[in-house]
Swiss-Prot record:
EC number: 6.1.1.14
SUBUNIT field: Tetramer of two alpha and two beta subunits.
Protein name (Swiss-Prot/TrEMBL): Glycine--tRNA ligase beta subunit
GO CC, any one term: cytosol
The encoding gene: glyS
Keyword annotations of the record: Aminoacyl-tRNA synthetase, ATP-binding, Cytoplasm, Ligase, Nucleotide-binding, Protein biosynthesis
Length: 691
């Protein structure tokens, strides 16, 4: 007979962002537990609200699956003496399996006989197994945990009730002072406590008490209600998926409603209005048919439509107060010049161990100058990025950003335009924060991309020099995110960024401009390179790149971000070539021999007069061809290296590299060093797994 089982964890209200990952965790842990316990079922259906996490398991078997297994014991020579008497080891083994020595058989494994017993394990009734779900509940983890009352146990929020019903029967267990029963709670204000007769009644019983327990169904209701309100008023509402998810996890019985605010607030930049509505009040904003922001909003109440107008009025008052503050700051901020704000940055700390924010901008200007020249900006672009670097943090000390910190950069652009700055300068100010997440939008403009790189390079270098290098999960200054941003911008713009060389140039430029911090930045360049390479590894892993290719390209001598990605693509694209194994093995042999050459030998010029066979001359010509091809990029380099593989093989067949004659040996090592240096541009090829 198939059964239905309900498990519900009743809690005080959870933070909205926790609900979805929590229910996913409960489903997975439950499924893993049932699999481990050999219990078959058809489906696990999740239910979640701010006050509950629940799973309904249907098609549940009567009991665990029976199993028969053959258990290996000690070797026969240990289990029996010469007369065939059973040893204590054999007797203890069979007793531990609930059997006797009469049940022993022998099996030979690699020439040695071992004791075996065949063991039958009857499945336990499902009711017994389900009581173990207590451990599933207590094993759950959350981003933040709390204790309550006098208990030492920690959970996301205090557990207030537990329901565990197998069909109509309660499965008894307790967590702290809460014991399972069949009683659950309806909506906090509209419903009442109820007793569930059978597990299958759960969803329907809660609906009757104003709780939509199915999160997907509740989300669909919210979306439908918002769409209807928008259609009724002729609005266009972009229902942001993230906001919809958050609102869905704040309510149990959703009722959407529309509100409005005074049109005078539309003079404020719409980013401020949207931030106030979406981020601070969790409102959905509306636009007209022309895409203009309207003085209206849609919100969702956790309740029914009773006294809804009072709810509308209350929400309008809260939003109006916030917008009134925004209008005040917007007006007051415009009474000062950008120069006034930049002056104030001289008293604002970037970090007390590093510098002020004004000093950071001076460093970033020096770095931006190096980058502008390196990536080939034209005069107008260079002028824009240098001007932006002089002022790009000014909005941090405006009243608006003080109130709406998430608008830093955005308000910088708005105020810069109002004060007559070049639009390219204003855009760069906004874009320098990008990307703000691992997959966030990237700077759209070239000056913005350069300023973003300069700002991020400065932050990482100075924090490293101050000894604040991320370790483990600890990264309070988001340096990993900034390093990822550097990598993604380089990819997006297709800019060569040799990190080691550039970092040295940055430090030199700061020193020349007399803006270098009193920190040993030069001593952190190797750490910076490795830090950037760690981010490259992560991005390549996310792209499902082969692990050996990742190891090869990031262990190579190059610190050029774009070159490393290009090398990975090239190696991956040729990995299935018929000659790939021969090419890599030949080049690896070259590299290993070249590593035996002292630095002064590797740097010497190859002398053809010292060649003793034709293969040396052919290799010499081949290396010259590869060197020429390398100037056209890594793709041409790999093709040339692959083309001379037969030449390399013939060379090794005919030539003893480590000749007794010093001059001949050093000449050969110098040749191989030239070829190895070219091959290493693709990475440490010895890391590749070739078959």
């Amino acid at each position: 007979m198939a059964h239905t089982f309900l498990l519900e964890i009743g809690l005080e209200e959870m933070p909205a962002h926790v609900v979805t990952p929590a229910i996913k965790q409960l489903v997975k842990r439950t499924a893993d537990y049932l699999k481990e316990e050999r219990v078959d079922y058809d489906e696990i259906k999740p239910f979640s609200t701010p006050r509950r996490l629940a799973v309904l398991i249907t098609g549940l078997a009567d009991k665990q699956r029976d199993i028969s297994e053959s258990v290996k014991g000690p070797a026969k020579k240990i289990a029996q003496d010469a007369e065939g008497n059973w040893s204590k080891a054999a007797i203890g083994f069979t007793r531990g399996q609930g059997l006797t020595t009469d049940d022993i058989t022998f099996k030979e494994i690699k020439g040695t006989e071992y004791v075996y017993v065949d063991k039958f394990i009857a499945g336990e009734p499902v009711a017994t197994v389900l009581a173990g779900l207590k451990d599933v509940i207590t094993a759950m983890t959350f981003p933040t945990m709390m204790k309550w009352s006098t208990h030492h146990f920690q959970y996301i929020r205090p557990i207030r009730w537990l329901v565990a019903l197998l069909d109509a029967d309660v499965i008894p267990f307790s967590i702290l002072d809460v014991t399972t029963d069949r009683n659950t709670r309806g909506h906090r204000f509209l419903g009442k406590d109820i007793s569930i007769a059978t597990a299958a009644d759960y969803e329907g019983d809660l609906t009757s008490e104003f709780v939509i327990a199915d999160a997907d169904k509740r989300k669909s209701m919210i979306k439908t209600q918002i769409d209807k309100l928008a259609a009724d008023h002729g609005w266009t509402v972009n229902v942001d998926a993230g906001l919809l998810e958050e609102v869905n996890n704040l309510v149990e019985w959703p009722t959407a409603f529309a509100g409005s605010f005074d049109e005078k607030y539309l003079t404020i930049p719409e980013e401020v209005l949207i931030t106030s509505m979406r981020d601070h009040q969790r409102f959905f904003y509306a636009r007209d048919a022309q895409g203009q922001l309207l003085p209206t909003f849609i919100s969702v109440r956790n309740g029914n439509d009773h006294d809804l107008q009072n709810v509308v009025s209350g929400n309008e008052k809260v939003l109006t107060a916030r917008l009134e503050d925004a209008m005040f700051f917007y007006t007051e901020d415009q009474k000062k010049t950008i120069a006034d704000y930049v002056e104030r940055l001289k008293t604002v700390s970037f970090h007390d161990k590093i510098s002020t924010m004004a000093e950071k901008m001076s460093r970033v200007k020096a770095i931006a100058g190096v980058l502008a020249k390196h990536v080939g900006l034209n005069d107008a672009q260079t002028k824009a990025v240098l001007r932006a670097s002089e002022i790009y943090k000014f909005d941090l000390v405006t009243g608006m950003v003080g109130e709406f910190a998430e608008l830093q950069g955005v308000m910088g652009e708005k105020y810069a335009l109002l004060q007559g700055e070049d639009p390219a300068v204003a855009q760069a100010i906004r874009e320098h924060y990008e990307p703000i997440s691992a997959d966030g939008a990237l700077p759209a403009s070239v000056p913005g991309a350069v300023l973003a790189l300069a700002d991020k390079f400065d932050s990482i270098l100075t924090f490293f020099a101050a000894g604040m290098i991320p370790s483990g999960s600890n990264d309070p200054y988001a340096l990993r995110r900034q390093a990822t941003g550097i990598v993604r911008i380089a990819q997006d713009q297709q800019w060569s960024l040799p990190v080691a060389d550039l970092a040295q140039a940055f430090v030199a430029a700061e020193t020349t401009a007399n803006v270098a911090p009193k920190l040993d930045q030069a001593g952190q360049i190797d750490a910076l390179v490795n830090f950037i390479k760690d981010r490259i590894r992560k991005i390549l892993r996310s792209a499902k790149q082969r692990h050996d290719i990742i190891d090869a390209v990031t262990a190579g001598s190059s610190s050029d971000v774009l070159q490393i990605f290009t090398a990975a693509d090239i190696l991956a694209s040729h990995a299935d070539d018929a000659n790939f194994k021969d090419v890599i093995e030949s080049l690896t042999r070259v590299i290993r021999l070249a590593q035996k050459a002292p630095a002064e030998v590797a740097a010497t010029t190859v002398d053809p007069a010292l060649f003793e066979n034709d293969s040396e001359g052919q290799l010499h010509q081949g290396v010259a061809t590869v060197a020429t091809a390398a100037k056209d990029g890594l793709t041409a380099l790999y093709t040339a290296l692959a083309d001379i593989q037969p030449v390399i093989a013939a060379y090794f067949d005919a030539t003893m590299v480590m000749a007794k004659d010093d001059a001949v040996r050093n000449n050969r090592l110098a040749e191989l060093s030239r070829l190895a240096d070219l091959a290493l541009a693709l990475g440490d090829l010895d890391q590749l797994v070739v078959k």
